[in-house]
Amino acid sequence: MKNLYRLSPLAVLVLASCSSNQTVDPNAIPEGTILKVALLETTDLHQNILSYDYYGLKADTSLGLERTATLIKAARAENPNTVLLDDGDVIQGTLLGDYQAVAAPVTCSGTLAVHKVMNALKYDGAGIGNHEFNYGLTFLSQITNTDFAITGVQKPGACGAPNFPLVLSNVVGVTSLKPIFNPYAIIAKQFSATKPDGSSIDVKLNVGIMGFVPPQIMDWDQKHLAGKVMVNGVQESANTYVPELRSKGADLVVALSHGGLDASAYSPKMENGSLHLSTTGIDALMLGHAHLIFPKAKEIGAPALDASLAALPASQVDTVKGLVNGVPAVMAQSWGRRLGIIQMVLKYQAGKWVVQKELTNVEARGFKYKDGTTIVDADASIAPLVDTEHKATLNYATQAIGTTSDFEMSAYFALAGDVSAIQIVNQAQIDYVKNFIASSTDTTIASYKTIPVISCSAPFKAGRNGPTDFTDVAPTATVANPFGLQVRHPGDLYLYGNNNLQAVKIKGADLKNWLETSAKQFAKIDPAASAEQDLVPSYSTIYNYDVFFAENNALTYQIDVTQAAGSRIVNLTYAGKAVVATDDFIVATNDYRAGGGGNFPGIDGSKTIIKSPDANQAVVSSFLKKQAKITAATNGTGQSWSFVKTITQGPVILRSAPGKIAVARTLGLHRVSSEGSLDTSGFAKYTIDLSK
């Protein structure tokens, strides 16, 4: 179905009837009438429609909107009055997403596969995430059928799009200063309430929704957004639009905030400023971006609360009840793996609906919610909706690129020193930048030929989204039986197809600070502690763990995890000499990092010397094709970093995919000494011997 209208920036009325009975005039609603409502949330779907891994060409029952659909159906059966909302990052994140946006872009007459499914599931509304901007404003305008009123951004006509309102409150055009999407919408729902005498009555409830994205989109997608849009702070935007929503008749106001929780003092530039929306007069807060579970999961054997959430002040955040300064809040993880549910009770008092806060219940419900063991079945109606797109993606994914590998490239132990899935990325980036400089006719660029070129890349798929979320390319490869690489593999090695390669010119002091920031991923280990210690307490920001490399392994460094963050990097050398503060380096990286993504000191866009039109993923693909074959000796064993050797009294563990101790043995990672039991998230606990 095509969305043939541009919604008013003031308010949108979306009528959804839950009863054939005539709606009663609000004035006729008896005092004390009770209305029970469940707000349902998905977030960070990232085009994970089916329970399928396009990189590994295998089923993955831990994810997929087709199973979330089963959770939605169950929640609707339990709660007759529901509002289904999404918190953004829908269109990008799998090969299916890249196929529909880049390899074979969906036409105006078509509709994105994920939007087709969301339409079928009858979503009531959605926010916008930072990854919605990855493919550019013209593509986003087309697939949402929205006129942004920005010069040079023009959709080709009335295009296939979601059937529900999309809202974004804090992104405006630089010329118009008006929101490019509707800043809010009012969804008029007809629900069944209970009068004081116990009888039923049909009532109308106006649910107002607003959407927010991190201001950092201006850094992360600068190439698409610079000079076209600007981003306002989430709190300032909410303070503008909450009163408008109330004045337009919103009974409930829900913030769809594509950001996590940060208890730091508020700043309009905060990436995760959602906590500060709780003081703006909203009634409910739906969270995203961080790919975490909030509140703590309730099913039997539920995963432990992420360390970053557990560290939030209890005076502001109740991680059990799901309250942020008293406002109910939920984050449904990512990839369709959970459904956020906020059950609210409203009482009709003095002519308006009043939330009975003490009766609110919040849950981030997972696939095993019934008994902690049984995974819900997929909704059989979903797969047929996207069968054509699924088959086309598989055909695309399995095309040969003409290169073989004699070794497995995996990220199971990337946080224990393995570089088998990272070195090839760094080699590709160095090769690109050196060739760029060598062939440049720009006199400034040409003058950099004598400066060492190094590279950094992060293990993007290293457990952030659960124990199945690990890069693993060519798992069966051996010297005797090389593995033929396919189109899908560069995306497994470098997940983000939207990143473009950039290079920055830095000093040795900058390099040291960069490495110190990366090393914050590790916990501070107490050698005298007898209790078990996690080497990596949270994988939520694993994309900020940059691993550096130079040709011939000329760059080496050590990490001392017994020291406080900021004081961990020692023995930093290049070509056998200690790196000093004034040394010059050129670092091949991506536009996200070069532009300031991750808040690395001094890396803020001002040191960028090369802005490539080529995506990092494409650079990796081209490099692989040029090699004809890659080998462990040349492309997978250049371990540039190690831990400072430390004897610990108690066990230090690293959580990774189960059953991979043989991988560590093959890699020669002797510090990975044994595989232990599974934790409640399904990760295996590997013992790390820091003395080796």
Predicted regions and their residues:
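Acidic, metal/ion-coordinating pockets
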Residues: N21-V354, E358-T360
